[in-house]
């Protein structure tokens, strides 16, 4: 089993946090200490303890060892992904230091991205440049909706073009009323050059549900 995994998505709001939580649960059930890391988190809210992001809080709660919030999310940003990531100075070295600290504490670190694969940072570099720098193998979350086949194939190709291994992909049913759901999954299986690691059904409040049962990590457990 690899010690560091990066979770990206075909778009924003496709279920990266839900799948990251499922991965953390599955790894913990297999006897590994697994922690979540979301270096950059947008749409954070002001609280009595400072800025907090809901996705990062879910990763913190789902980690198998106790972590403080700053370890999970060193950059909690207000606003949407476009403005937050371009208006705030993001230090890639700080992101790397956080990853190294968590790697020293846990068997596996699940790193969750921000938005999709090609998100621009404030210095005109892509977030994916940092992923390439750290040589993180990637798991792709495909939010099953109209247009997702195109988004998935383009994202997968971009990851491969950046020289990183695409370990696998996970389908997340974000639209319970989508027609031709089974056909969409079948086409993704045929077209994506990586194994399917799981399929999450549409679930109300998935952050409160056991999710490991929807994954099969056999393909990346060697």
Swiss-Prot record:
This is ATP-dependent dethiobiotin synthetase BioD 2. One of its GO terms (biological process) is biotin biosynthetic process. It is found in: Cytoplasm. Pathway: Cofactor biosynthesis; biotin biosynthesis; biotin from 7,8-diaminononanoate: step 1/2. It catalyses: (7R,8S)-7,8-diammoniononanoate + CO2 + ATP = (4R,5S)-dethiobiotin + ADP + phosphate + 3 H(+). GO terms for molecular function: ATP binding; dethiobiotin synthase activity; magnesium ion binding. It comes from Yersinia pestis. Catalyzes a mechanistically unusual reaction, the ATP-dependent insertion of CO2 between the N7 and N8 nitrogen atoms of 7,8-diaminopelargonic acid (DAPA, also called 7,8-diammoniononanoate) to form a ureido ring. Homodimer. It comes from the Bacteria.
